[in-house]
Amino acid sequence: MKQVGLRIDVDTFRGTRDGVPRLLELLGRHGIQASFFFSVGPDNMGRHLWRLVKPKFLWKMLRSRAASLYGWDILLAGTAWPGRRIGAGNEAVIRAAAESHEVGLHAWDHYSWQAWSGVWPQERLALEVERGLLELERIIGRPVTCSAVAGWRADQRVVKAKESFDFLYNSDCRGTRPFLPQLGSGVSGTVQIPVTLPTWDEAVGTAVDIAGFNRYLLDCIHRDAGVPVYTIHAEVEGIAYADQFNELLTMAAEEEIQFCPLSQLLPADFSELPSGKVVRGELAGREGWLGREQLLTSGI
């Protein structure tokens, strides 16, 4: 069996309320555990609409059929009215996920992190993580041991800002395999587990059409020579394309692919991991900068 980390990002109020229960049902049916990363503060995702002036973002929204994919309640959230508090309004759903799956922090305010984390000082970065962490821990009633920043908006500043929270791992960038980010003076930071595989919205309309996506993704997994990690979104695979995701899980099992929480990808001895950095870069199918893995050693 080929082991693949399954990361589930939950960005919005509707994704939490409607998408997560459907995903829990599907994962339970297939006997799969995953890592859920929750946004718990205000849902201001509609404020991304200003990015439509950027051709690359506009093309992404058009080719992914964003209005039918996400729904207007998501696309307009937090624009003409204050965004609803995601965690406070969906505590039972988040607790249900925590009963059977690994649960980590995605963001306090997903929109603000994507829009401003690149210029925030380190103190503000740490404050945003702390706000989300305290809220998520209050909801699930236990310490949160992992996190994954919104939109992979991370660099070495973010790595350093998160060091005080004692996470087991972070999943803040795109890359090929888990690594130890270097903080300077020979000191290593918290393990990073990069996402290695394309997401639905990155691939559909560019590399493949909707009908061919499952086959495309499974072929990517088979070719992945690193430590494969796949990200889905509660707003996509948990709502509009839940049936297609169900088919993907069936096909994966038939091809001896086993999805698992990200923590199960870590070695017993972290000294085996390569060292590296999280640097800014770009990725086909995604607008704007994101964190990319830059390996400095190959590891054992």
Curated annotation (Swiss-Prot):
GO terms for molecular function: hydrolase activity, acting on carbon-nitrogen (but not peptide) bonds, in linear amides. InterPro entries: ArnD, Glyco_hydro/deAcase_b/a-brl, NODB_dom. The keyword Iron-sulfur does not apply. Keywords: Antibiotic resistance, Hydrolase, Lipid A biosynthesis, Lipid biosynthesis, Lipid metabolism, Lipopolysaccharide biosynthesis. Gene3D superfamilies: Glycoside hydrolase/deacetylase. It comes from the Bacteria. Pathway: Glycolipid biosynthesis; 4-amino-4-deoxy-alpha-L-arabinose undecaprenyl phosphate biosynthesis; 4-amino-4-deoxy-alpha-L-arabinose undecaprenyl phosphate from UDP-4-deoxy-4-formamido-beta-L-arabinose and undecaprenyl phosphate: step 2/2; Bacterial outer membrane biogenesis; lipopolysaccharide biosynthesis. Its EC number is 3.5.1.n3. PROSITE patterns: NODB. It catalyses: 4-deoxy-4-formamido-alpha-L-arabinopyranosyl di-trans,octa-cis-undecaprenyl phosphate + H2O = 4-amino-4-deoxy-alpha-L-arabinopyranosyl di-trans,octa-cis-undecaprenyl phosphate + formate. Residues 2-260 form the NodB homology domain. GO terms for biological process: 4-amino-4-deoxy-alpha-L-arabinopyranosyl undecaprenyl phosphate biosynthetic process; lipid A biosynthetic process; lipopolysaccharide biosynthetic process; response to antibiotic. The keyword Iron does not apply. GO terms for cellular component: membrane. Catalyzes the deformylation of 4-deoxy-4-formamido-L-arabinose-phosphoundecaprenol to 4-amino-4-deoxy-L-arabinose-phosphoundecaprenol. The modified arabinose is attached to lipid A and is required for resistance to polymyxin and cationic antimicrobial peptides. Belongs to the polysaccharide deacetylase family. ArnD deformylase subfamily. This is Probable 4-deoxy-4-formamido-L-arabinose-phosphoundecaprenol deformylase ArnD.
